[in-house]
Amino acid sequence: MDPTNSPQEPPHTSTPGPFDGPQWPHQAPRGMYLSVAVLMGIVVISASVVNGLVIVVSIRYKKLRSPLNYILVNLAMADLLVTLCGSSVSFSNNINGFFVFGKRLCELEGFMVSLTGIVGLWSLAILALERYVVVCRPLGDFRFQHRHAVTGCAFTWVWSLLWTTPPLLGWSSYVPEGLRTSCGPNWYTGGSNNNSYILTLFVTCFVMPLSLILFSYANLLMTLRAAAAQQQESDTTQQAERQVTRMVVAMVMAFLICWLPYTTFALVVATNKDIAIQPALASLPSYFSKTATVYNPIIYVFMNKQFQSCLLKMLCCGHHPRGTGRTAPAAPASPTDGLRNKVTPSHPV
């Protein structure tokens, strides 16, 4: 195909358009594309396995189907869709060195990755809010029921649709980004149309959920510390408090590590059109955010002992490896287990 026919490139250039042919060595060396393909391949396999396990185990074991666990399944579904619609597409494109599926599917990929990514992001915020309401009891003796959980899950999808559909209708757009093997919101063009959308997206889909997470977990930690202070200051209690603190810090840091580089890059590029950023460097925040689909279920689900028990029973065909026969011996609950399950819910507190 004649590269001068591509609408993405000015005439008289030897660089193919992002949908026309390999972008190496014009954007980056071929080795860079293959390295990203390897990373995306690892993410696709790992995220598909861990999120698939979360969904299957939650469906199979009734005791995991509590209202407070709905949001964890919602998060796993969103992460699985990001993997299927984003990471797998990026894997194929990086092997070929360009966006092989064409402009229309570029827009669809950008939309689907943004939609499901923001659903996952807001799922983390709703989970934090649920933990705050259940543990800190600002509403008194309020119990989450199925309708509350369904409402929370529905909100994440409706809110995300509200802010990811406009680029399909003319308010900004979805375009190839970085190495030009994945698509996302148009941070690059500038102008009031794009800048107003980027600013709105930043506030509604990053600042707001981050504020909710920080508020909820800060109050949760203070409540748990106050409860621990009323108990005997034994080594076990202190260990439980330290473990919960580390878990909360891990949750917040995982959120920031995933989304802060991406949003920072977007704002810098959107507000400084003259800045020159290497394509490989510009791609890092986007690809790095996709790795959250692997560690989200590990932090929020696999660290919960009740889920671990159900997972082991399923993988071992009903036989618990830590016990004899088909059931595991009951172990007394420790303060560590109790406080940890307040942060990563397996059942209402």
Swiss-Prot record:
Function: Produces a slow and prolonged phototransduction response consistent with the non-visual function of pineal photoreception.
Tissue expression remark: Pineal gland.
UniProt keyword list: Chromophore, Disulfide bond, G-protein coupled receptor, Glycoprotein, Lipoprotein, Membrane, Palmitate, Phosphoprotein, Photoreceptor protein, Receptor, Retinal protein, Sensory transduction, Transducer, Transmembrane, Transmembrane helix
GO biological process, one term: visual perception
Residues covered by region (Disordered): 1-22, 325-349
Disulfides per UniProt: 106-183
The protein's name in its UniProt record: Pinopsin
Description of post-translational modifications: Phosphorylated on some or all of the serine and threonine residues present in the C-terminal region.
Organism per entry: Columba livia
